[in-house]
């Protein structure tokens, strides 16, 4: 599966424990990454300072669903399940 252009759910819904430029403590779940632009594209994509965890994430129908809204909901659900 290819990422949907303009989605950005993986840059909003999950927590990221790794430090990011401008977010040294990482990113809490449900908080928009500082590097997500107005078109929901990653400003760090392809740059060496992009966290490895972001580069390792791959689009998957079970996580991304059929729409941006579904992806946000599914990733938020995974956050709850994996936080327990």
UniProtKB/Swiss-Prot annotation:
UniProt cross-references to Pfam families, sorted A to Z: CxxCxxCC
PANTHER family per record: UPF0153 PROTEIN YEIW
Family: Belongs to the UPF0153 family.
Listed name of the protein: UPF0153 protein PA1578.1
């Amino acid at each position: 599966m290819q990422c949907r252009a303009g989605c950005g759910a993986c840059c909003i819904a999950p927590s990221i424990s790794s430090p990011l430029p401008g977010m040294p403590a990482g990113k809490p779940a449900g908080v928009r990454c500082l590097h997500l632009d107005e078109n929901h594209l990653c400003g760090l994509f392809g740059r060496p300072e992009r966290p490895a965890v972001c580069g390792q994430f791959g689009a998957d129908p079970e996580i991304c669903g059929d729409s941006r809204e579904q992806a946000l909901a599914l990733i938020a659900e995974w956050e709850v399940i994996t936080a327990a």
